Amino acid sequence: LFECSFSCEQEKEGDKPCKKKKCKGGWKCKFNMCVKV
C-alpha cells in the first residue's frame, strides 16, 4: 500500500504550492492510503 497525501499543510515546502499525491489507476485514497478499488 502507498501513502496518499495527509493534509495540504504537510505537503507545502516554503512558498511552493502544495501537491497532493495521487493514487494510480485502479486505486483510490482511503484513510491516507492507496487501496485497490
Swiss-Prot record:
Keyword check for Disulfide bond: yes
Cross-referenced PROSITE patterns: HWTX_2
Top-rank taxon, per record: Eukaryota
Subcellular location: Secreted
GO terms under cellular component: extracellular region; host cell postsynaptic membrane
Gene Ontology molecular functions: toxin activity
Tissue spec. comment: Expressed by the venom gland.
Keywords (A to Z) from UniProt: Disulfide bond, Neurotoxin, Postsynaptic neurotoxin, Secreted, Toxin
Principal subcellular localization: secreted
InterPro entries (UniProt xref): Hwtx-2-like
Role this protein plays: Lethal neurotoxin that blocks neuromuscular transmission. Acts cooperatively to potentiate the activity of huwentoxin-I.
Record note on quaternary structure: Form 1 and form 2 may dimerize.
Recorded family membership: Belongs to the neurotoxin 12 (Hwtx-2) family. 02 (Hwtx-2) subfamily.
Listed name of the protein: U1-theraphotoxin-Hs1b
Species this protein is from: Cyriopagopus schmidti
